């Protein structure tokens, strides 16, 4: 089974690569890519095959790159490991020839924005932590960037 993981300098990608490398029941070949030269990021040395990718901000070039790797390596599954890639793949899902599993573009875009996602969940009567407008009376607060994958 040929599995492609991109953005392999990231912690998410490294974790997925490590998990895939432990699978012994199937013959898993991990194909990785990133904008860096091989050896400039740890993930490039942990995959079976490595390709240098164009920046994800060059959308059409990046989609073409994915399709070329799919054709060359006969990719069975692409695992998106970053928010940016998830948004891009959902946006161009009909143009990407590789199999991947993601929600539709509207849903991925909504949940990329933590404030909009929280408001949508509240509107549908789903309990979520409250949003604080005034932090002076709060004892403990978790700060979260609106468009990121982590908290402070």
Which positions does each model-derived feature cover?
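Active-site nucleotide/adenylate-binding loops and adjacent lid/helix of ATP-dependent enzymes
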Residues: 108-152
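Surface-exposed loop/turn and secondary-structure junction residues enriched for glycine/proline
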Residues: 54, 103-104, 111-114
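Short, well-ordered turn and helix-capping elements at secondary-structure junctions
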Residues: 34, 104-106, 147
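ATP-binding N-terminal substructure of ATP-dependent carboxylate-amine bond-forming enzymes
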Residues: 1-102
């Amino acid at each position: 089974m040929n599995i492609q993981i991109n953005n392999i300098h990231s912690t998410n990608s490294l974790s997925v690569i490590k998990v895939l490398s432990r699978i012994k029941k199937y013959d898993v070949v991990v194909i990785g890519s990133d904008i860096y030269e091989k050896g400039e990021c740890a993930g490039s040395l942990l995959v079976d095959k490595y390709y240098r990718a164009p920046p994800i901000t060059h959308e059409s070039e990046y989609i073409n790159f994915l399709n070329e790797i799919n054709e060359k390596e006969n990719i069975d599954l692409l695992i998106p490991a970053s928010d940016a890639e998830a948004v891009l793949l959902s946006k161009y899902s009909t143009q990407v020839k590789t199999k991947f599993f993601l929600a539709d573009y509207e849903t991925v875009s909504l949940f990329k924005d933590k404030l909009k996602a929280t408001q949508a969940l509240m509107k549908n009567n789903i309990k979520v932590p409250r949003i604080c407008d005034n932090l002076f009376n709060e004892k403990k607060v978790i700060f979260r960037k609106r468009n990121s994958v982590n908290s402070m």
